[in-house]
A protein has these predicted regions:
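Boundary at the C-terminal end of the N-terminal hydrophobic targeting segment
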Residues: 25-29
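Catalytic phosphate/nucleotide-handling subdomain of diverse soluble enzymes
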Residues: 275-277
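Bacterial N-terminal signal peptides that target proteins for export
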Residues: 3-13
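Extracytoplasmic/periplasmic copper-protein system
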Residues: 294
């Protein structure tokens, strides 16, 4: 009877979490005003955090599961990258509990993702796969590379709702600042992932069907972390658009959950750490000088 009661409570909580994301809204800068892509309520993170994240007895093998170092893609190249601005050790960031693989919280997260997988439309899947390719590659620094300009254009995708003036060709100072900031955030993202070595959701729950396995650990989400960092920078340049920009970053985060490649807790940690990361940047004198130059550029280029 006790087990049945627990299952019922888990079912009800899972249902509440699913209902919290079954809203439809217009995304910031969503091309063609497409309103058919569900947007999440951030309250589903709060609900999941209420669930016990500690390991359950008798699951030592499951809890020992880590992302294998041998499966890391390009790790040697990643480790060679040095930061432009960021200097804080990752231990300076807020402690965030990574739920154990066997925990009730991880089970609730996996159930949530299975329900997303069951209910996602072909249109939503196509949208997720599209924006999965919109990221900045810090190793693509050769201007003769055919994808060099596209790589830098990707830095501007999150803020596309600011208007047509917000573009690489129009904002060289902004392009340089964002490329350096996201470069730094990628360096930190790798360090976080190596430290926690969290296995991907599909490694714990084989019913999650993915397009292809990814070459690094789950925690935190790189797409989410970089998007929230980008949003935090832009929100300091356009504070009146902060809510829109954070919603745009949330699109990236939720798309990773919808694809089954990241836990919600990966996304939430990314949001928290991104805010701290940007706060730390403002302690760097060179960053502040470069940021002030970008503010002047915006004052000249942004329509009044």
């Amino acid at each position: 009877m006790k087990n049945e009661t627990y299952k019922f409570k888990r079912y009800i909580l899972g249902l509440l979490i699913i209902l919290s994301v079954m809203t439809v809204s217009k995304a910031f800068g969503n091309e063609n005003g497409n309103t058919n892509i569900r947007q999440p309520e951030t309250s589903h993170y709060e609900k999941l955090l209420q669930i016990d994240g500690k390991p359950q007895p008798g699951n030592e093998t499951l809890d020992a599961l880590k992302f294998p170092l041998s499966e890391w893609g390009g790790l040697y190249s990643w480790k060679l990258l040095k930061t432009y601005y960021a200097t804080k050790p990752i231990d300076a960031f807020q402690k965030y509990e990574v739920p154990a693989n066997s925990s009730k919280r991880t089970r609730a997260e996996l159930d949530y993702m299975l329900e997303l997988q069951r209910t996602r439309s072909a249109e939503e899947l196509a949208w997720c796969l599209k924006i999965a390719d919109i990221y900045y590659d810090p190793m693509n620094i050769n201007p003769t590379n055919p994808k060099y300009n596209q790589n830098r254009d990707n830095l501007f995708y999150l803020g596309r709702g600011l208007g047509s003036w917000y573009a690489r060709e129009n904002l060289p100072q902004t392009t340089e600042l964002l490329s350096r900031v996201v470069h730094d955030s990628m360096v930190y993202m790798v360090e976080f992932k190596l430290k926690y070595a969290r296995p991907r959701p599909y490694a714990v729950e084989p019913r999650l069907k993915i397009e292809k396995p990814l070459p690094h650990g789950s925690f935190p989400s790189g797409h989410s972390f970089n998007s929230y960092v980008n949003a935090e920078i832009l929100a300091r340049l356009a504070p009146e658009r902060r809510a829109d920009l954070m919603n745009a970053a949330q699109e990236f985060a939720w798309s990773r959950e919808l694809l089954g490649v990241h836990y919600p807790s990966d996304s939430e940690a990314s949001r928290i750490w991104a805010a701290q990361f940007v706060k730390f940047l403002f302690e760097n004198k060179q960053f502040v000088r470069d940021f002030e130059a970008v503010k002047k550029e915006w004052a000249q280029k942004r329509p009044k």
